[in-house]
C-alpha cells in the first residue's frame, strides 16, 4: 500500500503546484486571461466570431454586385483534373471548406458553400487580415497620415524608445516585412507567457505589445513570423489617423469597394476595444473576393484609386533577401 500513498502524495503535490501556477498567472496577467487560455481549443473557423467581442463594419451604402456567368461543371472538371480527384465538391466538403468562389472577368462562374454555410455566413479572414492591414497602411501613406513606411516606429509609438532606445532603428517597413528583430516564441516554459497565447488571448493587446516586445536581433536581417507586428501596425494606424482601425477600414475600404454585407473586426476585449489585427477580420466570402479584385485592378475600384498602384506593386513583389517567398509587406502570396 506504500506505493498508493506515494502516488497520492505525488498527485497532491502536482495539484498544489498547478494551483499555484495558475494563481501566479492570474495575478501577473489577469483571471480572465487565464480562463481564456485554459479554455482554448484547437483552432476552429468560428474562433474570431464566437470567442471575442466584435465591432461592426456596416455594409456599403453603394454595394457592388458581381455579375453571374455560372459554369460550375467546367470549373469542377478543371479542378478535378488538376487535383486528381473524382468529385471536387466532395473534396472541398471533406476538407472542411466553408465556401469556394471562382470569379472570371468580374463574373461569378462557380459559387458553392459547404458544411452548413451559405452566402449569408460570416467567415473569418485569419491571416488574410494581414493583407488588409497592409492595404490600410498603404492608404494611410497615400493620404499623408503616415509620411513613409521608412519612418521609425517610435515616431508613432514613442513610448517604445523610452523602454529601449534601439526601437528607434525599427521602421514601419520592418513590421510589414516581419523583419523587425523582435523576439517571438510561440510557447515558453510557462504556459501563460508564450507569445502565441499572449497575442491571441490577452485582454489588452495595446499594453502587451508595448510592454512585452523585446529586441533580440538587428532589424531587416531576416523574416521571423511575429504576431506583435500587426498589433503594432494597428496602433500606428490609430495614432496616425486618429481613428479606430474599424472606422478607418469602414471609410477607406469597406464603403469604397462596395461591400454588400456587414462585417466585423474581432476585438481583444470590450474594455480595451482594440482590433485583432493578426487574424480577426470577419466578412462574407463574396465580399472578401472584392478585396482580391481591388488588387487585381491595381488598387482601382470603378474609376477611383482606393490604394495607390505604387503600393499595390510594392506590396506584391517578393524580396528574396528575406528568404521567405510567402510574405512581402504583409501580403501573403498564394
Which residue ranges define each predicted feature?
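N-terminal leader/targeting segments and the immediately adjacent pre-domain N-terminus
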Residues: 2-118, 145-146
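Active-site SXXK
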Residues: 106, 124-149, 175, 233-237, ...
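Short, charged, amphipathic alpha-helices and their helix-cap/turn boundaries
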Residues: 109-112, 154-155, 189-219, 243-262
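Flexible glycine/proline-enriched surface loops and loop-helix/loop-strand junctions
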Residues: 118-119, 213-219, 229-231, 270-277
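Active-site helix/loop module of the DD-peptidase/beta-lactamase fold
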Residues: 143-182, 214, 239-278, 283
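Active-site-proximal alpha-helical segments within enzyme catalytic domains
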Residues: 229-236, 277-300
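Long, well-ordered core segments of solenoidal/helical folds
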Residues: 252-262, 312-323
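Conserved small/polar residues in nucleotide/adenosyl-binding loops
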Residues: 332-334
Amino acid at each position: 500500500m506504500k506505493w498508493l500513498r506515494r502516488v497520492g502524495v505525488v498527485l497532491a503535490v502536482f495539484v498544489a503546484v498547478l494551483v499555484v501556477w495558475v494563481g501566479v498567472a492570474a495575478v501577473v496577467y489577469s483571471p480572465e486571461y487565464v480562463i481564456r487560455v485554459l479554455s482554448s481549443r484547437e483552432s476552429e473557423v468560428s474562433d474570431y466570431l464566437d470567442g471575442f467581442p466584435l465591432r461592426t463594419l456596416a455594409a456599403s451604402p453603394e454595394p457592388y454586385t458581381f455579375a453571374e456567368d455560372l459554369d460550375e461543371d467546367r470549373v469542377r472538371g478543371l479542378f478535378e483534373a488538376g487535383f486528381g480527384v473524382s468529385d471536387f465538391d466532395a473534396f472541398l466538403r471533406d476538407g472542411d471548406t466553408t465556401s469556394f468562389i471562382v470569379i472570371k472577368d468580374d463574373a461569378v462562374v462557380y459559387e458553392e458553400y459547404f458544411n452548413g454555410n451559405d452566402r449569408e455566413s460570416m467567415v473569418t479572414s485569419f491571416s488574410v487580415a494581414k493583407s488588409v492591414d497592409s492595404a490600410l497602411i498603404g492608404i494611410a501613406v497615400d493620404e499623408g497620415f503616415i509620411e513613409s513606411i521608412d519612418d521609425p516606429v517610435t515616431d508613432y509609438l514613442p513610448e517604445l524608445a523610452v523602454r529601449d532606445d534601439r526601437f528607434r532603428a525599427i521602421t514601419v517597413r520592418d513590421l510589414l516585412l516581419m523583419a523587425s528583430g523582435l523576439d517571438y516564441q510561440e510557447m515558453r516554459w510557462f504556459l501563460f507567457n508564450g507569445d502565441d497565447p499572449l497575442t491571441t488571448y490577452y485582454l489588452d493587446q495595446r499594453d502587451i505589445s508595448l510592454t512585452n516586445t523585446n529586441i533580440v536581433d538587428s532589424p531587416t536581417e531576416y523574416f521571423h513570423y511575429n504576431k506583435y507586428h500587426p498589433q503594432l501596425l494597428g496602433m500606428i494606424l490609430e495614432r496616425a489617423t486618429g481613428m479606430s482601425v474599424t472606422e478607418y477600414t469602414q471609410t477607406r475600404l469597406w464603403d469604397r469597394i462596395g461591400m454588400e454585407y456587414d462585417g466585423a473586426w474581432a476585438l481583444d476585449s470590450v474594455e480595451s476595444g482594440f482590433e485583432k489585427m493578426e487574424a480577426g477580420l470577419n466578412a462574407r466570402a463574396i465580399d472578401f473576393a472584392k478585396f482580391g479584385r481591388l488588387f487585381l485592378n491595381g488598387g482601382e475600384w470603378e474609376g477611383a484609386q482606393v490604394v495607390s498602384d505604387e503600393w499595390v506593386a510594392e506590396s506584391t513583389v517578393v524580396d528574396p533577401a528575406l528568404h521567405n517567398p510567402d510574405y512581402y509587406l504583409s501580403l501573403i502570396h498564394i
